[in-house]
């Protein structure tokens, strides 16, 4: 089985911090489990990133994908790109109810 290198961009790390801060204000007991669930889901990207759907966002020469991470009654979306050197770059993370990536 092919294994990919995982690269979490600074923007994606900032998204996790933003989501954590929001959840901490809403329900402090959910913040840690939500972020932990997202971080554990990253492991799928190391082994089967092609199993995730293609994102609607497209730029010339780039194919972006989204991983759905279920949590509670909704969940989160992780935007990523598979690089030619077998690296998966996590670009952004958002709640499913957010209109767009930040």
Q: What annotation goes with each model-predicted range?
A:
Residues 1-65:
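Basic, Lys/Arg-enriched alpha-helical interface segments
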Residues 69-102:
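Enriched for short, Lys/Arg-rich terminal
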